Amino acid sequence: MTKTSETTKIAIAHGNYIRGSASKVRRVLDQIRGRSYRDALIMLEFMPYRSTDPITKVLRSAVANAEHNLGMDPSTLIISSAWANSGPVMKRYRPRAQGRAFSIKKQTCHISISVESAPNKTNAEVQN
């Protein structure tokens, strides 16, 4: 999905029904939000969390959308926003002692990442 306005072009990618809780995905997204595409990929590669694999897939999809649909250069892209919302919960039951059953909640989430090109710095901004 792409969205264009007068000043900036934004490319968005969504990953729906990803297994894992939204709170665990958010702690990774908080670290890469506002970073460049290259820096975010390096960070995701070395983070010790299970949720980095689906986040990497969604990030690569957003960059591919920007490159193919909007003709943007991947080296100039930054992650403008990234969020995770909770999805449906799969309920399973585990047998326990004396005929009891404990419920197991297998959570899912929806991941969304949007990228845009970094603002060009003028000579005056670079010197300051």
UniProtKB/Swiss-Prot annotation:
GO terms for cellular component: cytosolic large ribosomal subunit. Pfam families: Ribosomal_L22 (PF00237). Disulfide bonds: none annotated. GO terms for biological process: translation. HAMAP family: Ribosomal_uL22_B (MF_01331_B). This protein binds specifically to 23S rRNA; its binding is stimulated by other ribosomal proteins, e.g. L4, L17, and L20. It is important during the early stages of 50S assembly. It makes multiple contacts with different domains of the 23S rRNA in the assembled 50S subunit and ribosome. Part of the 50S ribosomal subunit. This is Large ribosomal subunit protein uL22. It comes from Prochlorococcus marinus (strain MIT 9215). The gene is rplV.
